[in-house]
Every structure is written in C-alpha cells, then in structure tokens.
Amino acid sequence: IGRRSAVVVDDGHLVAGLQQRKVLDLFGGTGAISFEFASRGASRVYCVEMAPAHASFIRSQARDFGLDNVTVVHHNVFDFLEICTEKFDLIFADPPYAIDGLAGIPDKIFSHDLLHPGCYFILEHPGDFDFSSHPHFVKERCYGNVHFSFFSADEEA
C-alpha cells in the first residue's frame, strides 16, 4: 500500500468504521487498498478493475492472502457505476490522473445513490481539481501533489 493511501486508510475515524462494513474500491490497480480494507475488518470489499491482468492479479493475491471477503469485478468503472444497484458504507477511488471523466466521478456516485447515509466517498486526485463546491464535499487532505477529497452521503455535508 502506498504511503499516501495508507494515511487515508489509517484515519482513525475510517478504520474504526470499517468493522463489518461493505466497501467499494474503484480503479483497483494492484488491489493494495482493497486488501488493506479487507484486513481491517470490512465484511465485504468489491474491487473494480478494468485491466484484465490487474483484475486477475488481484483475484490471485486475495486468494493467496486468504481474503475471501474481497470480490474482484472486472469492469470499466464508469460503466459499473451506471449498473450498480448495491449501497456501500465506504467508496474509495484512485483513478489514473489523466483519465477522462475524473471530475464527474462524485456526481456519478451520488446520482446513483451508492452510499448509505452518513457514509463517505473518498477520491484521490491531483491538485488541479477542486471539488469544494460539490454539494456533498466535506473536506480535502493534501500530501504534496496528491489530494484526497471526502464526500458524505448526508445532504447537510
């Protein structure tokens, strides 16, 4: 797990809240974040990854680590968000910074009602994105050029 992402996972509020929670990890990459959530007590982690080799690797690693609470979804994240009918207690997204559509990810999450009330969506992004005017924006944490924007499902966020 990368140091910057570990800082977010280590946030005391989020770690305590992971016990028996359902988590969605978008743009799974190597699966490190999914494995961290799973090892910290999440009851189910859905890891969405489009690249076949990455999805296969994550699936294999989860099996090797004995993490039967990790489900790998081999799918394009944007298409997945359109068809997903589940609700989650935490959603984390670490998209490639150059990906088209990064700015619209929060709107997709909230327009499809994917979070339980009071739960968080965390988006990792470069500093040239500013989500502070989004109606569900809560706070931003910065580590050098890496930014994490936190959004809440509550209307009063």
PLM regions and their residue ranges:
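Class I S-adenosyl-L-methionine-dependent methyltransferase catalytic core
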Residues: 1-157
